[in-house]
Amino acid sequence: MKQVTGGVCAAQGFSAAGIHCGIRKNQAKRDLALIYSAVPASAAAVYTTNLVKGAPLTVTKAHLADGKAQAIVCNSGNANTCNADGIAVAEEMSALTASALHIAPQDVIVASTGVIGQPLDLTPIRTGLPQLAAALGDHSDQAAEGIMTTDTQPKEIAVQFTAGGKTCTIGGIAKGSGMIHPNLATMLVFLTTDCAISAPMLHAALTGDVSDTFNMVSVDGDTSTNDMVAVLANGLAGNAEITAPGADFTAFCRALNSVTVWLCRRIAGDGEGATRLIECCVTGAEDHATAKTVAKSIVCSSLVKAAMFGADANWGRVLCAIGYSGTHVDVHKVDVFFRSAAGTVCVCTHGAGVPFSEEEAKQILLEKEIEILVDLNAGDEGATAWGCDLTYDYVKINGDYRT
């Protein structure tokens, strides 16, 4: 497996584009994105667990009932959520996309991200979609920009792997900076692959992966109304279709995971106002569920996040987060380390503090990427969660989001 350029356009048969059509006031910001497969593709998606769901999710879920799709359209600047006409608007957005691409409306995945509760005016989208379709090409970067809201940078990646003796590619773009606490900010992830895989196996791979990747990311503890992870697989790599578990399915899942973990880290590191990426690795758990819960509890802790912003090795906050995680952990067995490119420091052994250099710890925590290592010393299971520090800028960004 190797990383390649091209994002969602790296796989055979995929093209993309992103333009400014007028949804957002800032003309320098792209606000409409399109991903297109030259042939119909197997498709799967997972969605937010928030009971308040954006209209695009409802429409997309209906469209994917047959496990097929050929395009993904997404606007930024408006979530099309909690609107009386939201379903009709999302359906028309699908129809407009289908008309521009000469495909069926039910083969369009539709997504939106932005402000909740404001009507989505389709006028700029009606004008923009023909232009967007005409601009399709090797423009994954433009599509990545078109789905951004408070993100500071686009997020795209692609990798190549082998399945059935054929070289296959999987790529992805993502947005997410705030309201990131998925159980599947708004967090949107769009993946493309030329690997031939059936819709049921594609769905199995995606749901299995999301549980340990995107559902383990938290920026601010808020679960968005519009979270979606969607994948298209058009089969143009020419491998024998994956229809059951086996070596090829394992290879596909590993490639998928390499893409999703990379995107998880970029989403967490680009949290609103963030200055540091936090990766919490929990080992020594008696079961996987416990490891996941503990890791997520730590990265969700506002006090831990604030301590990381201040480069303060306040390990007691880590123990506190473990204690209220709801798991049955013997805190008297817990070891805690902080690690970064500047080194590693042990701050807690068997649930009690140990002498360490505060200055050394501070230098470790001043790095842009920080690891919180927790050993529960109770078993062989582990899990990883991602988050970011909590800064003054987070409040500033969200205090005037609508203005």
Protein language model annotation of sequence segments:
Residues 1-88, 92, 98-403:
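A structural signal for small-residue-enriched, beta-sheet-centric alpha/beta enzyme cores
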